[in-house]
Amino acid sequence: MKIGVLGLQGAVQEHVRAIEACGAEAVVVKKTEQLTGLDGLVLPGGESTTMRRLIDRYGLMEPLKQFAADGKPMFGTCAGLILLAKRIVGYDEPHLGLMDITVERNSFGRQRESFEAELSIKGVGDGFVGVFIRAPHIVEVGDEVEVLATYNDRIVAARQGQFLGCSFHPELTDDHRLMRYFLNMVKEAKTVSSI
């Protein structure tokens, strides 16, 4: 199983290590042609507006949308969640606009720029430590979206079909259960596409 990590900016190597720790092959994606042959893609945390500029500069917007249209799973963490969202509070247009959610950037306030919280994640388990760094949260979800985790009544993880998104940085701990959950999504998608 080959998983790409969008390597334009952000916590790229940490995701590579998490993918490899789960027994899959990781590929850092910086060019369009590197999307070929991938089974899934991680959109890492970083700074969403910088990532968007780089996506545009390297001509990755349409290839990423095509990757999604081909039914391949995508996992967005922190800034990656913002890239996936169809709606962003205070912005007229989304980035990739693939997941039927509304997100608010930096929504935990400056006093809480960075913190850790123990989460219970549906399909993953309890006692998962979420590392939040200038994190967004999901304000609203569409009918097809399943809420997987909340923190202080805010949605911090959700899934819609082939798309998985979370507000926190799962790659910054040694608990790889959420990455395993994503890899299972990728396995399921591969099974369906080969039928």
UniProtKB/Swiss-Prot annotation:
Pfam families hit by this protein: SNO
GO biological process: glutamine catabolic process; pyridoxal phosphate biosynthetic process; pyridoxine metabolic process
Oligomeric form and interacting partners: In the presence of PdxS, forms a dodecamer of heterodimers. Only shows activity in the heterodimer.
E.C. no: 4.3.3.6, 3.5.1.2
GO cellular component: cytosol; glutaminase complex
Protein name: Pyridoxal 5'-phosphate synthase subunit PdxT
Family under the similarity heading: Belongs to the glutaminase PdxT/SNO family.
Catalytic activity annotation: aldehydo-D-ribose 5-phosphate + D-glyceraldehyde 3-phosphate + L-glutamine = pyridoxal 5'-phosphate + L-glutamate + phosphate + 3 H2O + H(+); L-glutamine + H2O = L-glutamate + NH4(+)
Naturally occurring in which organism (per UniProt): Geobacillus thermodenitrificans (strain NG80-2)
GO molecular function per UniProt: glutaminase activity; pyridoxal 5'-phosphate synthase (glutamine hydrolysing) activity
Coiled-coil parts of chain: none
InterPro entries: Class_I_gatase-like, PdxT/SNO, PdxT/SNO_CS
Keyword Membrane attributed: no
Matches recorded under PROSITE patterns: PDXT_SNO_1, PDXT_SNO_2
Lineage of the organism: Bacteria, Bacillati, Bacillota, Bacilli, Bacillales
